[in-house]
Amino acid sequence: MSDNTGTPEPQVETTSVFRADLLKEMSGAGSAPAATGADNLPAGSALLVVKRGPNAGARFLLDQPTTTAGRHPESDIFLDDVTVSRRHAEFRINEGEFEVVDVGSLNGTYVNREPRNSQVLQTGDEIQIGKFRLVFLAGPAA
């Protein structure tokens, strides 16, 4: 705070860290499975990588018949933001295929920027839950 001596207060500057490695990984440059470790996943499992949102870069393993996602603290994938419903979506494994199912969320679930109640997922699909954008990467087939 200035004490009226005519001396201006110092300006505070902020900086951000640019992570080129994360950008390259998310843009699909090079081999996406190798860059993310999806090729090392157990057979029949998959990986969700947070591309955008408060915890960008976080990874979630999909290896159970049903994996829940939402704002509820007991969700398997806890996405803590008001744009996410408490019980927002489920990721299900059906006959070797991964499917995302909206479970009655307020803001909906999007796959590749299109609203979906349910959708079978392919490697590289982008799932939006609230302000979070996650990329789906399938591991080796079972």
UniProtKB/Swiss-Prot annotation:
The keyword rRNA processing does not apply. Keywords: Cytoplasm, Phosphoprotein. It is found in: Cytoplasm. Residues 67-116 form the FHA domain. CDD domains: FHA_GarA_OdhI-like. Gene3D superfamilies: 2.60.200.20. GO terms for cellular component: cytoplasm. The modification Phosphothreonine is found at T14. SMART domains: FHA. Its main location: cytoplasm. PANTHER family: NUCLEAR INHIBITOR OF PROTEIN PHOSPHATASE-1. An essential component of the PknG signaling pathway. When unphosphorylated, it inhibits the activity of 2-oxoglutarate dehydrogenase. When phosphorylated it does not inhibit 2-oxoglutarate dehydrogenase. This is Oxoglutarate dehydrogenase inhibitor. The gene is odhI.
